[in-house]
């Protein structure tokens, strides 16, 4: 991290199965008026994505996110490839879409999607991959999409 980049920490509640595997997550951010702008989307924390500005509360030496001050309008997804497939498979299959991808140490692929990028084609591909049983995914921030509404209705 450089001098103007800080970690903003997010508390992570666990679900009944114990997911996520940690209780907090640091996300790189830069100070801006009114809070900190996220420089990447989180791996586990929901409700925030790249570019969002969050308010924080200082505890000890750390800044802890308390709320979203400004929503950048971006959305994010986390994709888990099923073995024997891996992150390279996910990245290859989704390379044609307008998104930025990065892979975690444990093989999750995080997709960051700008508010100006076409939403439905990428969502259709994510859903297809789930239905083909090659991956599962969740949305850290869900876009407004007719594809999602139809999928939720079954």
Where are these regions (language model features)?
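Short, Lys/Arg- and Gly-enriched loop/turn segments at beta-strand edges
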Residues: 59-71
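Extended boundary segments
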Residues: 1-21
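Short, surface-exposed secondary-structure edge patches
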Residues: 42-48
